[in-house]
From Swiss-Prot:
<dbReference type="InterPro" id="IPR036754">
    <property type="entry name" value="YbaK/aa-tRNA-synt-asso_dom_sf"/>
</dbReference>
<dbReference type="InterPro" id="IPR033730">
    <property type="entry name" value="ProRS_core_prok"/>
</dbReference>
<keyword id="KW-0030">Aminoacyl-tRNA synthetase</keyword>
<dbReference type="GO" id="GO:0005829">
    <property type="term" value="C:cytosol"/>
</dbReference>
<dbReference type="GO" id="GO:0005524">
    <property type="term" value="F:ATP binding"/>
</dbReference>
<dbReference type="Pfam" id="PF00587">
    <property type="entry name" value="tRNA-synt_2b"/>
</dbReference>
<comment type="similarity">
    <text>Belongs to the class-II aminoacyl-tRNA synthetase family. ProS type 1 subfamily.</text>
</comment>
<dbReference type="InterPro" id="IPR045864">
    <property type="entry name" value="aa-tRNA-synth_II/BPL/LPL"/>
</dbReference>
<dbReference type="InterPro" id="IPR023717">
    <property type="entry name" value="Pro-tRNA-Synthase_IIa_type1"/>
</dbReference>
<keyword id="KW-0436">Ligase</keyword>
<protein>
    <recommendedName>
        <fullName>Proline--tRNA ligase</fullName>
        <ecNumber>6.1.1.15</ecNumber>
    </recommendedName>
</protein>
<keyword id="KW-0648">Protein biosynthesis</keyword>
<comment type="subunit">
    <text>Homodimer.</text>
</comment>
<dbReference type="GO" id="GO:0002161">
    <property type="term" value="F:aminoacyl-tRNA deacylase activity"/>
</dbReference>
<keyword id="KW-0067">ATP-binding</keyword>
<dbReference type="InterPro" id="IPR002314">
    <property type="entry name" value="aa-tRNA-synt_IIb"/>
</dbReference>
<dbReference type="InterPro" id="IPR004500">
    <property type="entry name" value="Pro-tRNA-synth_IIa_bac-type"/>
</dbReference>
Length: 568
């Protein structure tokens, strides 16, 4: 491609409303243009990257036995009503009526539609297994779209759905997709982790997220550097401290703590170690009763773990201030298990503590020297906290570390959640109807671009991996419109690279060198060759990788092989 025939539109500054680096750079480099909140036009340079991502995904899905379909963006309400998601989905599901007053929705996902197709088309066990996928536009009416394409309302997603005759076969389909996802993200050239995850609103009981590692990531990824253990923060297990609980050595004493409402204030007031304090959180049980949950002062309650405890409302609901006063006779900041007659749930770490400091269920009062079994009943014990860096790994192979990540893919084993709700069955070997065992597998195609940039950029612009760069190589002739020698050398290298199947751009716009280089550093082309009169007189041209601080002089007659070696 010649730049004079392409569309290049770069900006020196990003709009003031751009939130994060990837959004700023994509707008400045002319990859996207905003049309409305969370809705963007894909410009030619950005669309090239999208198409390359789609190609890699499509190749690996086909390799894994996926069958491509295209499902409607507009979906009838009746299917969503069958699963109950028409009401449960909330405002993110954009609903509308057609001219006949029939209800429809713009698809945020396609479980209902594909399950409807399966129940009509896959009638026998002989038709299984099947795995259908699409790469299609989705729409979720986010309350506060932000971060550019990372959390837009309209986006492109690859979603796949597997149908199997048994849970065992569904597990094989899951493993097949997990392996395909690893190949996809390996080929995309991104640093990522596959982590065990909570199934969330999708449902099911087996799930992995694929997280691109980036300091700006929203998600905390927990892993063990010396083993294969990895999970997101919601699911990572906090191992109980080793050994038995120490014996009580202090008497229970009530201490006046005026205006102390937080753990930090308590530690400062009493001049104690935060690890000797216990934090009290009140949540609602299934019967709307107050349930007291306890974590160590320096730990945080894990809401996903907490709502999975039997008898606790799911999703988790925190008790109101009025309900807390009714149950404890005190306000938040002064609560504890001593004297409380309701249900008490302690984290594993708290259950091993002795002589701890806790609220006394009187405003501005705390207990020191509190102990389970002596001063209050033994609590129920569950893992209900977030892990922290340095915690022992659940597999016993070392200590945990935490990185930030951006979720770009997710695989779920659904079981019969949707097939049972929609009466989607097949006939087994005995001629009896059975619901399909299902899995669903998503990749945020356009989200990948934002994640890749958040992982790969510098103060000059983006740095694309070779596999998804808009152009792998850019040839930058200095004086293309003035020097016949430069034009001849640039045209020859351009033609030779094209003949070798290289995705190359020849910048023949006649821009000043500084402006030309700045454009391609912003756009992030990984390999650049600069050709100028001065160098050619010495038989040299310059090669520079986007990550290199300096260019390298290369013999003009060797530059083709040099570039090809860098692309290998």
């Amino acid at each position: 491609m010649r730049a004079s025939q392409f569309f290049i539109s770069t900006l020196k500054e990003a709009p003031a409303d751009a939130d994060i680096t990837s959004q700023k750079l994509m707008i400045r480099a002319g990859f996207i243009r905003k049309q409305a909140a969370g809705i963007y036009s894909w410009m030619p340079m950005g669309l090239r990257v999208v198409r390359k991502v789609e190609t890699i995904i499509r190749e690996e899905m086909n390799r894994a036995g996926g069958i491509e379909v295209s499902l409607p963006v507009v979906q009838p309400a009746e299917l969503w009503q069958e699963t109950g998601r028409w009401d449960a989905m909330g405002a993110e599901l954009l609903r509308f009526k057609d001219r006949h007053e029939r209800d429809f929705a713009l698809q945020p996902t396609a479980e209902e539609v594909i399950t409807d197709i399966a129940r009509r088309e896959l009638r026998s066990y002989r038709a299984l297994p099947k795995n259908f996928y699409q790469i299609q536009t989705k729409f979720r009416d986010e309350r506060r779209p932000r971060f550019g394409v990372m959390r837009g309302r309209e986006f492109t997603m690859k979603d796949a759905y597997s149908f199997d005759r048994s849970a065992e076969d569904a597990g094989k389909s899951y493993d097949n997709m997990y392996a395909a996802y690893r190949r996809i993200f390996d080929r995309l050239g991104l640093t990522y982790r596959a982590v065990a995850a909570d199934t969330g609103a999708i449902g099911g009981d087996r799930s992995h997220e694929f997280q691109v590692i980036a300091d700006t990531g929203e998600d905390a990824i927990v892993y063990c550097p010396t083993s294969e253990y990895a999970a997101n923060i919601e699911l990572a297990e906090a191992v109980a401290p080793a050994g038995e609980r120490p014996a009580a050595s202090a008497a229970l004493a009530k201490v006046h703590t005026p205006k102390v409402k937080t753990i930090a204030e308590l530690v400062d007031f009493l001049k104690i170690d935060i690890k000797q304090t216990v934090k009290a959180v009140v949540v609602e049980g299934e019967q709307d009763e107050a349930v007291l949950m306890l974590v160590r002062g320096d730990h945080e309650l894990n809401e996903v773990k907490a709502q999975k405890v039997a008898g606790i409302k799911n999703p988790l609901a925190f008790a109101s201030p009025a309900a807390i006063r009714d149950a404890f006779g005190a306000n938040p900041g002064s609560l504890g298990p001593v004297g409380f007659k309701g249900r008490v749930i302690a984290d594993r770490t708290v259950a091993k503590m002795a002589d701890f400091v806790i609220g006394a269920n009187e405003d501005d009062q705390h207990y020191t020297g509190a102990n389970f079994g002596r001063d209050c009943a033994e609590p129920e014990v569950f893992d209900i906290r977030n892990v922290v860096e340095g915690d022992p790994s659940p597999d016993g192979q070392g200590a945990l570390a935490i990185q930030r990540g951006i979720e770009v893919g997710h695989v779920f084993y659904l079981g019969t959640k949707y097939s049972a709700a929609m009466n989607a069955t097949f006939l087994d070997e005995d001629g009896k109807p059975k619901p399909f065992e299902m899995g669903c597998y998503g990749i945020g195609v356009t989200r990948i671009l934002g994640a890749a940039i958040e992982q790969n950029y510098d103060d000059k612009g983006m740095i694309w991996p070779d596999s998804i760069a808009p152009f792998a190589v850019v040839v930058c002739p200095v004086g293309y419109d003035r020097s016949e020698a430069v034009k001849e050398a640039a045209d020859k290298l351009y033609a030779d690279l094209q003949a070798r199947g290289v995705d190359v751009m020849l910048d023949d716009r006649g821009e000043r060198p500084g402006a030309m280089f700045a454009d391609w550093e912003l756009i992030g082309a990984p390999h650049r060759v600069t050709i100028g009169d001065r160098g050619l007189k010495e038989g040299k041209v310059e090669y520079q990788h986007r990550r290199d601080s300096e260019a390298t002089a290369v013999a003009a007659d060797a530059i083709l092989e040099h570039v090809l070696s860098k692309l290998a």
